[in-house]
């Protein structure tokens, strides 16, 4: 007998009086009145429904004059709903009708349940059958109208195709709670177009609109409430996936994209109201995904992760005393059963069931669980399910939370016939302790380390709405959680659309929460995560790299460090993922060769590649350059290398690559045409001059190469091969082949951009110049700016004799006496022209190279001093780099010590900033404190070049 506390009864007095006014014409026995008042006291929901629908509820609430609640047969729900819907003409009326039926039937079911007139299994059957009927009859009502409006969706045999509704979770298992949401997936049999008199629709569009209308009928909150909360997050790709999916697409998804937690979800999946052919097709589709042919102990690890997600989420929300999600709750019983189902279900057909009860019996028969333990588990499970129903029947709320307020506790005690709260709490605690102990036997105990390892797993799984996700991110101290969440969502959506196989998906699932933790702990989480994701996106289909990062903390640490320090590095890693191999050994990453050893390192990269395999050699050179450049950048960022050494290493690397490229070009050309007389691989009769930054040993990250090709070969005669060509043509083809090797874009990118415009006569000149012609041009025809460029030129490839010849030509040309006034005017005019075209006008940013007081001014000053005084001081021709030339000028008293140091200091600072900008992927300096350095440069400029 339901006997609520007197305090509860008095609190419902007003509601009872209001109810009697509405139903004054209805005669109740004293016992019936007492029962109704008690129900109102423990369930405000029943009271509200009785007051709102008196003519539909109370007139036949009791079975005659007795105390039993009159329930309709569960199998008649469908007919009753169909009959009611046949009397409405639009969706608004349909919504009102469905909500009235739902509230009245649920109120009576709640009453019968509370009064213990139905068993738990009977009530579960009622709730689930009503849900099936509401879905099926609503869909039938809508489908008929959609066909009239848009035509018939027909299959290849001209048969009308229904929309297929897949029930998940407790609905799928026919174990629905009193106030539960329903988890659905929508599908349709075949692609095509509707057939009808009006405008045809693609089947996907037709079923999508139909699904939206069905959700509206059931889920929309109107003045009359809801029928069911509809949750679509279990569909393929979750919230980002299509609302309705074809069966073929569904099959492809679970074969290629299905995740571990979806296997658990699919254990209970069933089609609701579908013909047998579709149900069979669905089960054949899903069975290989859910039940593996082998014993699958990996299911345990997947379950532990899912349980950890639930634990993290309940802790985040501050949830306590939750009889479903807490330790020892309903979900753990389900997990115990489902873990065994997924491990052995592929071999044991008796475990392929949606029912907890049937599956538990199967486990006992297979000796997988002790019979007494199974009996106690089911008893405890049923006890918690009864409490779950009572909690929800209080106010028709989907809750599994034990009440903390006095009224809620009194209501629950009354509904469960418990005299006091402490007794009930103790029974619940004992029940959940037994369940949790059994759960730990199956999946192992949890630890804080497990949670640390999983990191932010809950953010990566598609189980959170936006508000919950943002709350988690914000709780981690992130200033702009929305930006971070958008990055995560977009990347997650893209990753699920790209096939990487089960192994790849598993590795990505392990990696992503860890990387999220790295990003969130950083000062600029959004910036770091964006760079990390660009790299992970690039290797998503390369499982080995995902596993490398997931399993190698050192590699992850270096990746985060380098990506945060430099977007240029992250871009290089994204473009060339093979560089991730360099992160495995941090000690090796920061260990650089000596400048003189780069040639030997390159040879190691190429030594195992057959000479005739030019394509592989080209890729290997590119990969070597990228790997070595990454090591230089890593050493730069960590402070291992100083500025001058960075450029030294980058320049030495470029020289070694030039030597290898010329060698490769020579070998492939001579194999075809033979070689000129008196030449060989070690003495090609060919030299490469480096100009600009390479010539000045001031190369930066991403710098191109300014090159000039010269030869001392005799152009008379032909090569000595089977297909001989003229010697001049040979060297032209050699230059073309060198350019090809440098600039062709392979899968590994390009080697270097090469600029040959500084050769004699520029773009109009020959690609290769004979040394005599080279000397004559520089001596007789070169413009002042070409002589300035020559100051920074030096041989970077060639035998010593040819290098010496070229340097002698350079020295001879630079040492010519020049008209001081004419030289000064020419240099000033050229610089003014550059400023006019290259300076960023009206910009607060500083162009380190071109703006007044920048690098170009220092270079022009240096070049002026060489061209002005080298005829008198040949020492000025020894070097091609600015710092040593300025130092030499000071020692020759061509500059004061102050001016020389100011120029050198400014140049080194600007170069350092230039390296930093390159690593940041920028070209202009935004905020700087370099006004003093710029002014010192301008003072020198004015003193040397402007003052008369």
Swiss-Prot record:
Cofactor(s) named in the record: Mg(2+)
InterPro entries reported for this sequence: GlnE, GlnE_rpt_dom, NT_sf, PII_UdlTrfase/GS_AdlTrfase
GO BP field: regulation of glutamine family amino acid metabolic process
Domain of life according to the entry: Bacteria
GO molecular function: [glutamate-ammonia-ligase] adenylyltransferase activity; [glutamine synthetase]-adenylyl-L-tyrosine phosphorylase activity; ATP binding; magnesium ion binding
GO (cellular component) term, any one: cytosol
Gene3D superfamilies per UniProt: 1.20.120.1510, Beta Polymerase, domain 2, Nucleotidyltransferases domain 2
Function summary: Involved in the regulation of glutamine synthetase GlnA, a key enzyme in the process to assimilate ammonia. When cellular nitrogen levels are high, the C-terminal adenylyl transferase (AT) inactivates GlnA by covalent transfer of an adenylyl group from ATP to specific tyrosine residue of GlnA, thus reducing its activity. Conversely, when nitrogen levels are low, the N-terminal adenylyl removase (AR) activates GlnA by removing the adenylyl group by phosphorolysis, increasing its activity.
Family matches, as HAMAP family: GlnE
Protein name: Bifunctional glutamine synthetase adenylyltransferase/adenylyl-removing enzyme
Organism: Idiomarina loihiensis (strain ATCC BAA-735 / DSM 15497 / L2-TR)
